[in-house]
Amino acid sequence: MKTPSKIFLVGMPGSGKSTLGKQLAEKLNRNFFDLDAEIERMAGWVIPDIFEQIGEDYFRELENSVLTMLIKLNEPAVIATGGGAPCFFDNMDQMNGAGATIFINTPMDTIIERVKKEKSTRPLVNRMEDDSLAQDMEALYKKRLPHYEKASFTTNSNLQDVVQFLESAKS
């Protein structure tokens, strides 16, 4: 067996999916795609504007379409998804059927610290009040966890763990 053609990184906003994805793609000599960046490129809008002007339902449909397009690409790739992508439509099943899914299970304290710095670029987080951010993020995590747990592998964002998992998938 060889390394899966597509490797999908899933997890909460601020978990480090994009950072780890870039590192992993470089190590494996593959293209890297950030699902949110691809959505923005194709829509011609930034995600906060899509949420604000058109709504989350439209965004989720667009997200599903772009994810499906990336799955169908005829090239090996590492794909960092948006935090909610695995939780809508049959996205997680699609990803599991197309390659390896890796849940980046970063400690909540680290996630909160990161999203506070980038709150305005994260529509769901931006709606949360600062004094209840930790509680709201914890609730969001609990809601999404059953979807994330369908991943092939879970790590706390350690590149070496991911590489070892992929190496073991080869044998």
Language-model regions, residue ranges each:
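ATP-dependent small-molecule kinase phosphotransfer cores
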Residues: A37-N96, T121, E138
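Hydrophobic positions on the alpha1 helix immediately C-terminal to the Walker A/P-loop
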Residues: L20
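Hydrophobic anchor at the beta1->P-loop junction of P-loop NTPases
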Residues: L9
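Post-Walker A helix-loop "phosphate-sensing" segment adjacent to the P-loop in P-loop NTPases
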Residues: E26-A37, W45
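Conserved lysine of the Walker
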Residues: K17
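P-loop (Walker A) phosphate-binding loop of NTP-binding proteins
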Residues: M12
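A glycine- and Lys/Arg-enriched "phosphate-lid" helix/loop adjacent to the NTP-binding pocket
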Residues: A98-K143
